[in-house]
Curated annotation (Swiss-Prot):
One of its GO terms (molecular function) is large ribosomal subunit rRNA binding. Forms part of the ribosomal stalk which helps the ribosome interact with GTP-bound translation factors. One of its GO terms (cellular component) is cytosolic large ribosomal subunit. Belongs to the universal ribosomal protein uL11 family. HAMAP family: Ribosomal_uL11. CDD domains: Ribosomal_L11 (cd00349). This is Large ribosomal subunit protein uL11.
């Protein structure tokens, strides 16, 4: 059995249960002749058990026959960090100028465990450092050991 020829890839961040034909989904899929309604139905069906509105990075593979497959990744680290710090927005200033909230090292470790499949490391300590770096760049102070 031969594999289908790949026409291209589309990377989008789509809210869980919120795929609609409106931009950015409609235009991105329409350019590649993908059935937008079918994609929206399949995506919404596969995310129906998740909290509505959670941003999900999605990699859509489009094939030459206009069929598609998609892989849903874990939500961005910034989503989890904002949730744990109980803030709605990160700092717009550089990391040392404005601290907008705090997260604990245990929070970062917990987020790292959730994000492990999408991070480029298999070591939990390295993954925790990646998450701590994301927290610092968002203006969050990491407290604890």
């Amino acid at each position: 059995m031969s594999q289908k020829a790949i026409k291209g890839y589309i990377n989008l961040i789509i809210p869980a249960g919120g795929a609609t034909p409106a931009p950015p989904i409609g235009p991105a899929l329409g350019q590649r002749k993908v059935n937008i309604k079918t994609f929206c139905d399949e995506f919404n069906n596969s995310t129906k058990d998740m909290d509505k509105g959670v941003p999900l990075p999605t990699l859509i593979t489009v094939y030459e026959d206009s069929s598609f497959s998609f892989k849903i990744k874990t939500p961005p680290a910034s989503y989890f960090l904002k949730k744990y710090a109980k803030i709605t927005k990160g700092s717009s200033a550089t990391k040392k100028e404005a601290v907008v909230g705090k997260v604990t090292m245990d929070d970062c470790r917990e987020i790292a465990k959730l994000k492990m499949p999408d991070l480029n490391t298999k070591d939990i300590e390295a993954a925790t450092k990646i998450i701590c770096g994301s927290a610092a760049s968002m203006g969050l102070e990491v407290v604890g050991n």
